[in-house]
Amino acid sequence: MRIAYIAPYQGPSLRKARPIVRNISLAGSVKMEFIAGLLSAQKHQVEIISQGEVVELNCKWYPSLRESEPFHPDVPIYYASALPIRLLNGLWSSRRTFELFKLRHQRSPYDLVIIYNLKRPQVVCADYAIRCLDLPVVFEYEDDAFVDITGNDEAKARVPLGSDSSKLLNMVSGCMAASPHLLSQLPATIPKLLFRGAVGHDLMQASEQMRTVKKNWVLFSGTHYPSKGIKQLIAAWRELQMPGWELHVTGYGELTNILQEMVKNDPGIVFHGLVSRQELVRLMCSAKVCINPNDISQTPGNVFAFKIIEYLAAGAHVISTPMGPLEGEIENGMTYMSDNDPKTVVAALKQVILGATWRRTARQYVIDMYGPQSIAKKLDMLLQQTSAYYCSEGKNGKC
């Protein structure tokens, strides 16, 4: 099956060619790589088409390009051109991504389309694929399109095409989503997959090898956005004063420079910045505790941190703010915080470290549920069911 994966992927070439600090998504790109890699291993031909959007406005045109450092030799990645001028940026990104999708389809027709979230380029391409190309579309739903990151519904105005996005939810033929809340927004009749995260072979192997050499580390990994709670975590760690333990911080984003200043000359905090995948796996498997101090959401399940699954698979105990209901087996390896206020974070860290709660993990369950073999079977089943559903519905909307 030839698959177009239309997603805001950000590979090495894009990060070098365009200023994307403000909209960088590290975990999202990792998950896209995992999905595309598994589908390729199952003999599907996958192409990633990314808008490569630049949100920092400037009068500069960025030409389309192909990723020169692909994560997989059989998964080509194409980026649309960008023109980040006020009032034009979004329309340009949408139009150029759409034209790139049409061009790739004309050269070699696709059999199925996967879209990642409901940004304008994804909505436009999916609508065209359904109405004009008679192709089934699988919706990968990671972030609730109808509320903001804090779960407030006042953000409905940011849904890219208004009612068209809502209509698209009733037009797709399959869905994989990060939470039951997100899946509930789709029609009950279509094939669905609860897909919280994924565990790669690299993480599985390192986790097994390093199970007995855990260090007194607390690890934060992720994009440095205000909503991630990293500033509160650093403030809490300074107040905690836990001898023999270190806080390790990886990632990159708009707060990176501020965070570097905050941790300067603090021997209890190790700031790694943006690291390679190999180094990140080593850090995750070395830490006894990993932490996800996200801002509290008013709509539980509107997002789910992919890294929680990786943390647990690495054999770490996870401290997190609530992100919607989870399976009991997963929660066995977690400690919840009611919010990410520094005092709350301090209390949670004391509970986990001094009470040795860090010994309680959910490693094996997560590997069994979200390891490569399990996810590969579930993905393949979803694609088969989606194709069958599309045919059974007799949909045909070719222009």
Predicted regions and their residues:
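N-terminal subdomain of nucleotide-sugar transferases
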Residues: M1-P63, G174, Q232-Q241
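Conserved donor-binding/catalytic core segment of Leloir-type glycosyltransferases
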Residues: A4-I6, Q209-R238, H248
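Membrane-proximal helix-turn-helix segments that form the acceptor-binding/catalytic region
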Residues: E33-G37, K102, P121-V124, Y128-C132, ...
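A short, active-site helix/loop in glycosyltransferases that binds the activated sugar's phosphate group
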Residues: G52, C59-W61, D148, R158-L194, ...
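Nucleotide-sugar-dependent
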Residues: P226-K228, Q278-R282, K288-E310, S320-G328
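Nucleotide-activated donor-binding/catalytic signature segment of Leloir-type glycosyltransferases, i.e.
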Residues: I258-R282, V289
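Conserved acidic donor-binding segment of nucleotide-sugar-dependent glycosyltransferases
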Residues: N332-K343, K350-A356
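A short, well-ordered alpha-helix in the C-terminal region of glycosyltransferases
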Residues: A356-M369
